[in-house]
Amino acid sequence: MRIFFASSDSIALEVLRKVSDHYNVVGVLTAPDKPSGRGLFLKVNDIKVEAINRNITVLDPVVLNSDVIGMVKKLKPDLMLVFSYGKIFRQEFLDIFPMGCINVHPSLLPKYRGPSPIQTAILNGDTIGGITVQKMALEMDSGNILAQSQFEIKSFNTSADIFRYVSLNSFNLVLEALSKLNKGHIGIVQDSNQATYCSFFNKQHRMLNFNLSAFEIKNKINACNPWPLARAKLDKDEIIFHRADFIKTTDYSDQAIGKIVSFDPSKGILVKTEDGILLLLELQRSGRKVVDYKSFYNGNRDLIGKIFS
């Protein structure tokens, strides 16, 4: 089987490696190099680097035009495997592949169709997440399901944690999907009446509001890691939060919302919220390195009594 692989995100790196070990990957479609850092030097993404190291043909167009379609056709692919590429494919492009196109999507479809299923699951406080391999259709994430699995999302898990899990645990589902396609299976039709949707995450998500519940604030902090990273002001400094948990309690009910009320060596830095206590587990001052709550407290012994804004 001649596979054409499309991805622009390192979440797909492990799948690309394993698919390349087991199948003939004839080409990789990825995003063009992007300016990065203060010098705005062009940065090559991990998918492109891996493909080049394996001597796989790489296409990194800005637009999927007729020239790109012609280049893909010359590779004579049987099937396209898509995992976090970042663009919508036209039918003309999908029609290139005789065996069709499959897509790895990190949710239990039809739940969370769209670009941010992992972040949205954590933001909503879900305790179960999933991975789906679907046949691609013109309507976003609406294709027949070929393989699916679920996993537990723990209270303190961040999006970064789940990205790593999905990256390491998607290949076996891809194998299952490819096996079914070879046997002529068409997959399970999604129930569109059960579909829910998610949108792009952006920098507007990162500022915290301590008037929300501890559960909601914890979810936002964990959802925003690795990007855009939740934050709040403390005195004149910006504090960036990387991981949190919460306690539902009436303790400290007389304290101001957003106030750092205590430090517990076994739990975290305790912050009063609208209905309980937020536990800060990993954080940093802007411009400093990320540390756990014990190291942060040891370097900032005057924290207790200060109020986030």
From Swiss-Prot:
<dbReference type="GO" id="GO:0004479">
    <property type="term" value="F:methionyl-tRNA formyltransferase activity"/>
</dbReference>
<comment type="similarity">
    <text>Belongs to the Fmt family.</text>
</comment>
<comment type="function">
    <text>Attaches a formyl group to the free amino group of methionyl-tRNA(fMet). The formyl group appears to play a dual role in the initiator identity of N-formylmethionyl-tRNA by promoting its recognition by IF2 and preventing the misappropriation of this tRNA by the elongation apparatus.</text>
</comment>
<keyword id="KW-0808">Transferase</keyword>
<feature type="binding site">
    <location>
        <begin position="107"/>
        <end position="110"/>
    </location>
    <ligand>
        <name>(6S)-5,6,7,8-tetrahydrofolate</name>
    </ligand>
</feature>
<dbReference type="Pfam" id="PF00551">
    <property type="entry name" value="Formyl_trans_N"/>
</dbReference>
<dbReference type="InterPro" id="IPR011034">
    <property type="entry name" value="Formyl_transferase-like_C_sf"/>
</dbReference>
<dbReference type="InterPro" id="IPR044135">
    <property type="entry name" value="Met-tRNA-FMT_C"/>
</dbReference>
<dbReference type="InterPro" id="IPR005794">
    <property type="entry name" value="Fmt"/>
</dbReference>
<dbReference type="InterPro" id="IPR041711">
    <property type="entry name" value="Met-tRNA-FMT_N"/>
</dbReference>
<dbReference type="InterPro" id="IPR005793">
    <property type="entry name" value="Formyl_trans_C"/>
</dbReference>
<dbReference type="InterPro" id="IPR037022">
    <property type="entry name" value="Formyl_trans_C_sf"/>
</dbReference>
<keyword id="KW-0648">Protein biosynthesis</keyword>
<dbReference type="Pfam" id="PF02911">
    <property type="entry name" value="Formyl_trans_C"/>
</dbReference>
<protein>
    <recommendedName>
        <fullName>Methionyl-tRNA formyltransferase</fullName>
        <ecNumber>2.1.2.9</ecNumber>
    </recommendedName>
</protein>
<dbReference type="InterPro" id="IPR002376">
    <property type="entry name" value="Formyl_transf_N"/>
</dbReference>
<dbReference type="GO" id="GO:0005829">
    <property type="term" value="C:cytosol"/>
</dbReference>
<dbReference type="InterPro" id="IPR036477">
    <property type="entry name" value="Formyl_transf_N_sf"/>
</dbReference>
